[in-house]
């Protein structure tokens, strides 16, 4: 076998990776079609909530990274497609999380939703409603370090425009991004005097969510800074 090195090796690995990735997409598309065909043939299509989602997004070389775990948009944003018979069509702008799936399924099944569950049912959004008290920010915490993926521990908060991330434990690095002006998160604004008010607001929101979700580790490192 030919021995590859340097740029040639990197390009070969990338092409092999992309071929596998595209084969997975083709397989997912084919198998979703099989499920939809079955539901239609058995008169179940208009009586079934269809959900396609994933645990996280995936990097395809962005930020020099393949895989997931970091809180940057390519990984943080998770695919979610839902088809509710008679439900709203098109995009839903509200911020949702995977912790919302369980209460959604429970409500649709007519089962009680435990009081201590952290998510919110998506059923109102699927029906086209806009709840006034819907969340305006999202919390994230990655803590599996040291581990084989070598992703530093970090937590953060994202609202409809800004994202604040804190890498902690054996390092202490803060990052702030304006997702409207810098959607690829290439320009860290943390520490810039002109963003002092944004930093304070996002730090306050971060602390609020850490208390809401009962994250003592995040609170300890956030407050101690």
Regions found by a protein language model. Give the residues of each.
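Active-site-proximal cap/lid insertion segments
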Residues: 1-98, 108-116, 166-174, 183-186, ...
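Cysteine-centered loop/knuckle micro-motif
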Residues: 189
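C-terminal cap/loop subdomain of S1 sulfatases and analogous C-terminal strand-loop tails that border
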Residues: 56-62, 83, 88, 99-102, ...
């Amino acid at each position: 076998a030919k021995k590859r090195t340097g740029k040639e090796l990197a390009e070969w690995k990338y092409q092999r990776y992309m071929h596998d990735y595209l084969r997975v997409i083709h397989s997912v598309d084919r198998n979703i079609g099989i499920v939809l065909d079955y539901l239609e043939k058995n008169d179940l299509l208009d009586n079934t909530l269809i959900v396609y989602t994933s645990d996280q997004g995936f990097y395809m070389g962005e930020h020099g990274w393949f895989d997931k775990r970091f809180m940057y948009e390519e990984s943080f944003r998770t695919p979610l497609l839902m088809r509710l018979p008679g439900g709203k069509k098109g995009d839903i702008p509200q911020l949702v999380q995977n912790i919302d799936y369980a209460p959604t399924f429970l409500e649709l099944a007519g089962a009680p939703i435990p009081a201590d569950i952290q998510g919110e049912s998506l059923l109102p959004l699927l029906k086209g409603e806009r709840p006034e008290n819907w969340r305006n920010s999202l919390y994230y915490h990655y803590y599996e370090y040291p581990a084989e993926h070598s992703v530093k521990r970090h937590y953060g908060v994202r609202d409809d425009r800004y994202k604040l991330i804190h890498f902690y434990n054996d390092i202490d690095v803060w990052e702030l991004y304006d997702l409207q002006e810098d959607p690829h998160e290439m320009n860290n604004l943390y520490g810039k005097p002109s963003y002092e008010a944004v930093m304070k607001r996002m730090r306050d929101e971060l602390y609020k969510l850490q208390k809401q979700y009962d994250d003592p580790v995040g609170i300890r490192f956030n407050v101690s800074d």
